[in-house]
């Protein structure tokens, strides 16, 4: 069994006529098994690679309340600062779960207003329409049904 683990493949030398032919044609060797396993260097995942000056979106201010380029840069800086404020993962590699911060009732409903009166009137209209449809269907079914008298059944 130990000899089986020591087996390896040795690639034989390429014949001279093949090497001359490849040289004339300009053949480039493809990836081998060893070169396929090598991982390419990936850029840093900081998000800076897409924030180059020429790759940034164009900022157009149409109205008075629109964001300007300076305001966008401030918001991006705040987001980056918030990301850096997060705690680094623990050294021992354990995942720690924490309860989310509870929001106050003002934050939950900020900007949301709903009137139940409108919903109720819509629901009532839908219910009335469905009940009218059901009644008309019952009348149609009742008229199409055959009825037998009890006298006919006795005979």
UniProtKB/Swiss-Prot annotation:
Domain of life the protein comes from: Eukaryota
Stretches with biased composition (Polar residues): 128-147
Keyword Phosphoprotein: yes
Location of the region described as Disordered in the Swiss-Prot/TrEMBL record: 24-63, 80-155
Positions of post-translational N6-acetyllysine modification: 108
Modified residues (Phosphoserine): 50, 130, 147, 150
Pfam entry (one): DUF4604
UniProtKB keywords: Acetylation, Phosphoprotein
Protein name: Uncharacterized protein KIAA1143 homolog
Organism, as annotated: Mus musculus
């Amino acid at each position: 069994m130990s000899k089986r683990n020591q087996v390896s493949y040795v690639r034989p030398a390429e014949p001279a006529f093949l090497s001359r032919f490849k040289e004339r044609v300009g053949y480039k060797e493809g990836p081998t098994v060893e070169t396929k396993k090598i991982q390419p260097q990936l850029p840093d995942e900081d998000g800076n690679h897409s924030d180059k000056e020429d790759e940034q979106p164009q900022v157009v201010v149409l109205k008075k309340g629109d964001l300007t380029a300076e305001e966008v840069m401030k918001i991006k800086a705040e987001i980056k600062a918030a990301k850096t404020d997060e705690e680094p993962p623990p050294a021992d590699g354990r995942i720690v779960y924490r309860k989310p911060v509870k929001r106050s009732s003002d934050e939950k409903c900020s900007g949301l207003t709903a009137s139940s009166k409108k919903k109720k009137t819509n629901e009532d209209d839908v219910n009335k329409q469905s009940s009218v449809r059901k009644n008309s269907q019952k009348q149609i079914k009742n008229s199409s049904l055959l009825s037998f008298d009890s006298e006919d059944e006795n005979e």
